[in-house]
Amino acid sequence: LYKNNDFTIQEVHPLKGSICTKESSKDIYAVNEIVIKSVCSRTLHLDLRVNENKIQNFSGDGMLISTPIGSTAYNYSAGGSIIDPSLDTLQLTPLAPMNTIAYRSFTSSIVLSAKSTISIVPEYRFENSILVVVDGNEYRFNDITDINIVRSDLKLKLLRRSDFEFWKRVSEKFL
């Protein structure tokens, strides 16, 4: 493939997540998705904001933020939309949202401009029970105060076969 020059280069922007705790801040990067969920099997309550505008107090198993490349991975399995990788977007997909008289959470994914900042603030009682999953790798942080997710300015170069067609592959694998 490489020796025969039978490839194209696709540039993609990963997600950048800034995990802020009472003690420090750590940046993480994901090509596919960042998932915020509970360490144990219990409902999380999260304050969700987009560009500093409150969306809602979310209650459910967690929240998944994906890139267009990641839209066909865990995001799709969680009920999110498949996004054409040529589009400059972020996707926010709820995981098992609660909808009761006491809790109202959105039930479908939200597609946002890649210029958006997604802020997630856990209720104080959940600050030590959150698992951050980055492209399948699990991370635990103590005393999380907030999590901010943006499209990174970094560019990754993916080698693709010259005959790679996104929608053909989607139709073969998923539809």
Question: What is the predicted role of each segment?
Answer:
Residues 1, 10-18, 29-31, 46-47, ...:
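Short amphipathic alpha-helical surface micro-motifs
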Residues 1-61:
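Catalytic core of DAGKc-family lipid kinases
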Residues 11-15, 30-32, 42-46, 61-63, ...:
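A generic structural signal for short beta-strands and their flanking turns/coil linkers
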Residues 20, 36-37, 49-51, 66, ...:
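Short beta-strand-to-turn element immediately C-terminal to the catalytic PLP-Schiff-base lysine
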Residues 20-23, 86, 151-153:
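Short acidic-glycine loop/turn motifs at beta-strand connectors
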Residues 28, 36, 41, 50, ...:
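ATP/nucleoside-binding phosphotransfer catalytic cores, i.e., glycine-rich phosphate-binding loops
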Residues 57-61, 65-102:
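Gly/Ser/Thr-rich active-site loops/lids in small-molecule metabolic enzymes
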